[in-house]
Amino acid sequence: MSAKEIIFSTEVRDRLLRGVELLNNAVKVTLGPKGRNVVIDRSYGAPRITKDGVSVAKEIELEDKFENMGAQMVREVASKTNDLAGDGTTTATVLAASIFREGAKLVAAGMNPMDLKRGIDLAVTAVLAEIKLRATKVNSSSEIAQVGTIAANGDASVGEMIAGAMEKVGNEGVITVEEARTADTELDVVEGMQFDRGYLSPYFVTNAEKMRVELDDPYILIHEKKLGNLQTMLPILEAVVQSGKPLLIISEDVEGEALTTLVVNKLRGGLKIAAVKSPGFGDRRKAMLQDIAVLTAGQMISEDIGIKLENVTLDMLGRARRVLIEKDTTTIIDGSGDKASIQACISQIKAQIEETTSDYDKEKLQERLAKLTGGVAVIRVGGATELEVKEKKDRIDDALNATRAAVEEGIVAGGGVALLRAKSALASLTGENPEITAGIAIVRKALEAPIRQIADNAGVEGSIVIGKLVDSSDQNQGFDAQTETYVDMIKAGIVDPAKVVRTALRDAGSIAALLITAEAMVADIPEKNAAQNAGNGAMGGRGY
């Protein structure tokens, strides 16, 4: 075990604070509509230019181990806020730095850090409740567009695109952001259920111009295992031919003789048919097949539940209004599934999402949920250069996350105004002793930090802005940094999701309070420079 360096009390807080301030100084410049860009070096390729706070925070690693611990703890605030709310990372960083800075001063002046922490916790709880009270629900598409526009740094086209996507696929529908191959940013909405498996043979194609299979009002055979020969399938194939309807086969695979026979029948015109592989792998494949069965009012054909292929009848097959199959995707449009059955399946998946602790499982369950609840919208981000596309994609990701948060918990006045106005919750709050009251005062001062930083980034003196807003009786009045005017933030459409503001404050208060109560730090002693020792040769130990 390597030797350790241990530091105590004042030195602990000094070193932590230096690390916190270094990270905060790099992140805070991105806050607000006039926030600046940060250029991040890459080990290969062009540097990355971003205005996304969490992207900047994640890149910061300091040489001094003790300073680095401070930076990493505040970086954790940004990451956690991003994970929970999807936005507000810069606000969380600015709040955490402000609370710790003021707290460290008071501890250095002789106050009890544990009482300061109690005061901070009391104040944060009161402010969180106040913000929740001030939140108003998001109802209209225009309000959703406003939230998206603000989070995308005033880009109205992004806000409108996100609002359009949510309108099409529903609030729980999947909206993905991808890099486009053109210069334009566009929204592509996939109605119904889509999964990433295409036709097994191009001979199944019915629309040669678009190279896709189009099946109208088809039967859908959902089979768990591979199909190697068609002997067992003959009864159901004959029944489908007599019905005059097309047939889609979804199974683990269709190979050899079975695939050849299907293709020959299709080419002869005897049977309009197509086959695709099942989506997913392992147990997840079985679950997705079950979802397709529920959506199309069919049965999954599986020997596990005692159904053999030779015994399958037409009423066991799924139905849909239309199926489109391209090279890599299959889209089932308007399945015949019973609404109550689909809702029961949705409720079951939601319960599994609540119970699971694995991020990967949660993501896959959410994909299943989205496929059942309302299709998929894809925002394809275009730009003149790769750098521009990546920067824009960051902003759209932020905007999308902020919009989801707004739908969940409502909106409050943006631009730091909600935090500033929530100070009213602390007006009559006092602690059991002066040190707890001092902890409350730390939070009261920190609530001004985001609006001060937004003003500073716009080149305006933050203290003057705060003074004017405090004097105003209009609770929604704030500073529009874009136009450098004082406006009603709600009417001007400058809003923040309540969830983002609350998550930022809660996480910042939690980490900053822990930093204040740190009294000792332990880190490995850096190893001596190997190159220097090699240069000293046999006398490498000289000077010890």
Swiss-Prot record:
Nucleotide-binding found in the keyword field: yes
**UniProt keyword annotations, A-Z:** ATP-binding, Chaperone, Cytoplasm, Isomerase, Nucleotide-binding, Plasmid
Query: What GO biological process term is on the record, naming one?
Result: protein refolding
- EC no. given is 5.6.1.7
- Which residues participate in ATP binding? T30, L31, G32, P33, K51, D87, G88, T89, T90, T91, G415, D496
Q: Name one GO cellular component term.
A: cytoplasm
Subcellular localization is given as: Cytoplasm
What Gene Ontology molecular-function terms does this entry list?
ATP binding; ATP-dependent protein folding chaperone; isomerase activity; unfolded protein binding
Q: Which residues form the signal peptide?
A: none
Q: Does the keyword Nucleotide-binding apply?
A: yes
- Tell me what reaction this enzyme catalyses: ATP + H2O + a folded polypeptide = ADP + phosphate + an unfolded polypeptide
> Main site of residence?
cytoplasm
Class in the EC hierarchy, top level: isomerase
Q: Describe the subunit structure.
A: Forms a cylinder of 14 subunits composed of two heptameric rings stacked back-to-back. Interacts with the co-chaperonin GroES.
The job of this chain, per UniProt, is described as: Together with its co-chaperonin GroES, plays an essential role in assisting protein folding. The GroEL-GroES system forms a nano-cage that allows encapsulation of the non-native substrate proteins and provides a physical environment optimized to promote and accelerate protein folding.
Q: Which HAMAP family match?
A: CH60
Family according to the record: Belongs to the chaperonin (HSP60) family.
Return the protein name. Chaperonin GroEL 4
**Gene encoding the protein:** groEL4
